[in-house]
Design a protein with these regions (language model features):
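N-terminal export/targeting and maturation segments
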Residues: 31-69, 285-288
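Residue position within the beta-strands of beta-propeller blades
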Residues: 58-61, 125-127, 177-179, 221-224, ...
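A generic tandem-repeat structural signature
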Residues: 113-189
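Bacterial lipoprotein signal-peptidase II cleavage site
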Residues: 17-26
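Repeated scaffold domains used in trafficking and secretory/extracellular systems
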Residues: 42-53, 95-116, 160-172, 205-217, ...
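Surface-exposed loop/turn elements that mediate protein-protein interactions on large endomembrane-trafficking
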Residues: 27-41, 69-96, 135-158, 182-205, ...
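C-terminal motif of bacterial Sec signal peptides marking the signal peptidase cleavage site
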Residues: 12-15
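Positively charged n-region of N-terminal signal peptides that target proteins for export
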Residues: 1-4
């Protein structure tokens, strides 16, 4: 599983100095030549960030053992069998002519890094930059093809890709959308067969706290916080008490700056809803119908009516000794997260339903670092079936270090399973095993 952080940046590196609306209020939309059709938005990247759900199952980049190339592969949502996307008879799946061929490794990196994103009947192929730092090697690209890999064509090629971007990608059947943030600059980019375009930009005198938080109808949902000044960091070597006081001062400063909810359409037209999100929000906002749900770290819960622009506070989640933290929205209005209990070294993992307040603690199925129990990890929602990491097999392997000397280390490969969402939420762990072509997804 790979959480890839990259964006097309030959266009982006100059963006940090681009003109953007001044002030801390809502930015004006950028002009566009022609309006895009009003098609419903949906998220195309999975919770794990490494693949996408579409016709036929879970699409992702597969790395054959000891091969210096990568292929497109699909996990069947019924059988759990992973297969190479190409179905041409006699194809060896190791040349550019293969419908599933993703790309070859380049000098400086033996690993082909990238993602596949399904947007209805289209498959997008996003190759990340070579290397661990900003790279000038022109091996990055964004392609689009039919869902079976045929009719593939390049949208953007070459350039420099910074490894800094949102892992969330969205589509409307005609274009892909993602965001980029660097210090005081934020932008939303639209990708389609006409290329790539910045449809919205925002700049601030402070760090820009803006993000895409979801979709509703034909619009992206944005959160943006007004400028505020954080206290300076404590001196190096400060006591735990001083750091705790600093953390509380940061929270107080942040709470004084409202967190706004806004909408952005496919052309970059920005609309502030007038709604204010919770001051200490957990930053994951599932949407169901016209309702957006929000949770504070304290457990307070809200429902926002996006059509009526109203908000109501719901019954709080059960009280816990620590704060609630949530990470993903894996299925419907369910979110996953954890809370730390004061005085404990570990944390408790859970699933929460922010619509009805349900609380679920799934039974652990694997051990982190071979000793810490962990619950199943969500990979993708395949309709009414969940693809999950349910185990971890540890093994020793060897590699060559930067000094040219071999060394051995312990790593793990995940074990995956499929389960009906209804069964998992009822407490079942009766998985259909996923059969992989290689070591891992």
């Amino acid at each position: 599983m790979k959480r890839l952080l990259c964006i097309l940046s030959a266009l982006l590196l100059c963006a940090c100095t681009a003109a953007a609306p001044a002030g801390s209020g809502a930015a004006e939309a950028l002009p566009t030549a022609q309006p895009a059709s009003a098609r419903e938005m949906h998220r195309v990247s999975s919770p794990s960030g490494g693949g996408s759900t579409g016709q036929g199952g879970y699409y992702h980049v597969y790395h054959p053992d000891d091969a210096e190339y990568a292929l497109a592969a699909v996990v069947d949502p019924v059988t759990g069998q992973e297969r190479i996307l190409c179905s041409r008879s006699g194809c060896a799946h190791n040349e550019e002519s293969c419908l599933a061929f993703f790309g070859r490794a380049t000098e400086g990196s033996p690993y082909v890094s990238g993602n596949l994103y399904v947007d209805r009947d289209k498959l997008y192929w996003l190759r990340s930059p070579t290397g661990n730092q900003i790279s000038n090697i022109n091996d990055a690209f964004l392609d689009v093809s039919d869902i079976d890999g045929s009719n593939r064509r390049r949208i953007v090629a070459g350039g420099v890709f910074p490894l800094i971007m949102s892992s969330g990608w969205y589509g409307n059947g005609e274009s892909l959308f993602s965001s980029y943030s660097c210090s005081s600059y934020f932008a939303v980019y639209r990708f389609n067969e006409n290329g790539v375009k910045a449809i919205y930009e925002r700049q601030s005198t402070q760090q820009v706290l803006t993000d895409i938080i979801g979709v509703w109808q034909d619009k992206l949902l944005l959160s943006w916080r007004e400028d505020y000044v954080s206290p300076d960091d404590p001196p190096e070597g400060s006591s735990e008490e001083l750091w705790s006081a600093w953390d509380e001062a940061c929270r107080t400063a942040m709470k004084q700056a409202p967190l706004h909810l806004a909408m952005l359409d496919a052309d970059g037209n920005f609309t502030d809803t007038g709604l204010i999100l919770p001051a200490e929000t957990c930053e994951v906002y599932p949407v169901q119908g016209d309702s957006l749900y929000a949770l504070e770290h304290s457990g307070r819960r809200w429902r926002y009516d996006l059509a009526a622009s109203t908000v109501e506070e719901l019954e709080s989640m059960p009280a816990v000794e620590g704060d609630y933290w949530i990470y993903d929205e894996p299925y419907g209005t369910w979110v996953t997260g954890s809370y730390f209990t004061p005085g404990q070294d570990d944390y408790t993992e859970y699933w929460l339903n922010l619509a009805d307040g349900s609380y679920l603690e799934p039974q652990p199925t694997w051990l982190k670092a071979e000793c810490v129990p962990r619950i199943p990890y969500m990979i993708a929602d395949l309709g009414d079936t969940l693809l999950m990491a349910v185990g971890c097999q540890y093994y020793d392997t060897s590699t060559t270090g930067q000094d040219g000397q071999p060394y051995t280390f312990t790593t793990c490969r995940f074990i995956y399973g499929l389960i009906p969402a209804e069964d998992f939420l009822a407490g079942s762990q009766n998985w259909t095993p996923v059969t992989l072509l290689g070591n891992d997804l």
